[in-house]
């Protein structure tokens, strides 16, 4: 690829004592520039014109060094000036570029930016003595416009629609989204994979159950909805950016806000691994009641934290058991029992004898919770002693809490009797 460099590059850099080194991007841009049909003298003339414009506007816009730095400035001084005229064939090779009748330079800046409609202002030129001189639009932006600027108008339109959805009644939008998913046959697992929102949160939100989604997650969900409606299947190849946005109980620091429209910056939360001591406590409570209420879940969480709490050390947010984690564990436990019961029914229908579908589960819940499977072997070794101890401690903790509530009620009753 180096052998195909234009001769102008070798002449320009001949004063270097060492062989110049170029990046792949620079080589690609030089090749693109040469393929536009510009000659060596036209390229040098354009670069000299840009240098002169930078010098004239340095007081107003500051000195710029975006054309190769100081090394370029030294190299262009050693190159003779090009021809004073530009051929008509060269002028016609630049679409949208026509020479200005003015003999003076345009003193207004010519930035390489996009307007609100996503179109580049690449049709503005500064001329000298009726000759065309390329504007301050260099090859670097030519390589970028094909993939970074064309979607700006669509992004703005999607943002407007997302804001409109945020202002509408969420219950109506949920019905629309459910119908959309059913008609397109899009599973909630696919939506969860693209947006980074857990499947259970999506399911509960669409079914009007549980807490509402946060504003940022709701915007990400609505953005996916609008993009999928506009371009069916386009979002299926998207993946969330690697910036974690987790549930409020799991969050330790405020999440960063995405500044780039059209990107999803949501990801599933970290996985929580249940310790054996906590599993023993959970199993004991599960055997008593498979559907604990909020107060009971708080009690179970406190019992688990008391078991794993080490003296003089505070549990971190990742280690601490919360009522939400208890809720997910119980839901997964019931789901696993039901799944095993269904499997057992299928096997029995084929005349295969199976054991009770009970037992322990090691399946992951849809929110990313993970707990270890208990050892169902008949051997009872010393490593099970901590579990037995955990069960006893949980029972003691449960008794203490019950006595504390009973004692408080008795104190209130005695106070009323004294009055």
From Swiss-Prot:
Compartments it resides in: Nucleus; Cytoplasm; Chromosome, Telomere; Nucleus, Cajal body
Instruction: Using the UniProt entry, state the residues involved in the cross-link Glycyl lysine isopeptide (Lys-Gly) (interchain with G-Cter in SUMO2), renumbered to this chain.
Output: 60, 131, 161, 174, 217, 310, 412
For the modification Phosphoserine, the affected residues are 148, 170
GO CC entries = Cajal body; chromosome, telomeric region; cytoplasm; nucleus; PML body
Q: Which residue intervals are annotated with compositional bias (Polar residues) in the record?
A: 94-132
Which InterPro entries does the UniProt record give? Cro/C1-type_HTH (IPR001387), HD (IPR001356), HMBOX1 (IPR040363), HNF-1_N (IPR006899), HNF-1_POU (IPR044869), HNF_P1 (IPR044866), Homeodomain-like_sf (IPR009057), Lambda_DNA-bd_dom_sf (IPR010982)
The residues annotated as site (Critical for recognition and binding of 5'-TTAGGG-3' motifs in telomeric DNA) are 335
Q: For the cross-link Glycyl lysine isopeptide (Lys-Gly) (interchain with G-Cter in SUMO1), list the residue numbers.
A: 412
Entry keyword ATP-binding: no
Location of the HNF-p1 domain: 18-49
Principal location class: nucleus
Composition-biased stretches, type Low complexity, lie in 64-73, 81-93
Q: Where do the POU-specific atypical domain residues begin and end? A: 145-241
The alphabetized UniProt keywords are: Chromosome, Cytoplasm, DNA-binding, Homeobox, Isopeptide bond, Nucleus, Phosphoprotein, Telomere, Transcription, Transcription regulation, Ubl conjugation
- What does it do? Binds directly to 5'-TTAGGG-3' repeats in telomeric DNA. Associates with the telomerase complex at sites of active telomere processing and positively regulates telomere elongation. Important for TERT binding to chromatin, indicating a role in recruitment of the telomerase complex to telomeres. Also plays a role in the alternative lengthening of telomeres (ALT) pathway in telomerase-negative cells where it promotes formation and/or maintenance of ALT-associated promyelocytic leukemia bodies (APBs).
Q: What does the record note on quaternary structure?
A: Associates with the telomerase holoenzyme complex. Interacts with DKC1, XRCC6 and COIL.
Q: What is this protein called?
A: Homeobox-containing protein 1
Gene it is expressed from? Hmbox1
């Amino acid at each position: 690829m180096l052998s195909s460099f234009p001769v102008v590059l070798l002449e320009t850099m001949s004063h270097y004592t060492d062989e110049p080194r170029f990046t792949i991007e620079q080589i690609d841009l030089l090749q693109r520039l040469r393929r536009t049909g510009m000659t060596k003298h036209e390229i040098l003339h354009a670069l000299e014109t840009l240098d002169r414009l930078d010098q004239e506007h340095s007081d107003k816009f500051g000195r710029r060094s975006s054309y190769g730095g100081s090394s370029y400035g030294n190299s262009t001084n050693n190159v003779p000036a090009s021809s004073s005229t530009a051929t008509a064939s060269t002028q016609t090779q630049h679409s949208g570029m026509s020479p200005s009748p003015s003999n003076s330079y345009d003193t207004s800046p010519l930035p390489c930016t996009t307007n609100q409609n996503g179109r580049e202002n690449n049709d503005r030129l500064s001329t000298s003595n009726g000759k065309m001189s390329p504007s301050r639009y260099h090859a670097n932006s030519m390589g970028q416009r094909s993939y970074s600027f064309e979607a700006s108008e669509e992004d703005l339109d999607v943002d407007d629609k997302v804001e409109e959805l945020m202002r509408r009644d969420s219950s109506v939008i949920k019905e629309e989204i459910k119908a959309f998913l059913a008609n397109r046959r899009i599973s909630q697992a696919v939506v969860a994979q693209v947006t980074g929102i857990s499947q259970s949160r999506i399911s509960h939100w669409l079914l009007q159950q549980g807490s509402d989604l946060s504003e940022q997650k709701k915007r990400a969900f609505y953005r996916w909805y609008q993009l999928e409606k506009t371009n069916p299947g386009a979002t299926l190849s998207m993946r969330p950016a690697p910036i974690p946005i987790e549930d409020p109980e799991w969050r330790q620091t405020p999440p960063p806000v995405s500044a780039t429209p059209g990107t999803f910056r949501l990801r599933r939360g970290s996985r929580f691994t249940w310790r054996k001591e906590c599993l023993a406590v959970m199993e004991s409570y599960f055997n008593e009641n498979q559907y604990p209420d909020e107060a009971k879940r708080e009690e179970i969480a406190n019992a688990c934290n008391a078991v794993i709490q080490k003296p003089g050390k505070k549990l971190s947010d990742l280690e601490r058991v919360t009522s939400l984690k208890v809720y997910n564990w119980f839901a997964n436990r019931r789901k696993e029992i039901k799944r095993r019961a269904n499997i057992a029914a299928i096997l029995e229908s084929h005349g295969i004898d199976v054991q009770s579908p009970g037992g322990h589960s090691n399946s992951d819940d849809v929110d990313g919770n993970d707990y270890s499977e208990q050892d169902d072997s008949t051997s009872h070794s010393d490593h099970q002693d901590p579990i037995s101890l955990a069960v006893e401690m949980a029972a003691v903790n449960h008794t203490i809490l019950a006595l504390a509530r009973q004692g408080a009620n008795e104190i209130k009753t005695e106070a009323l009797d004294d009055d």
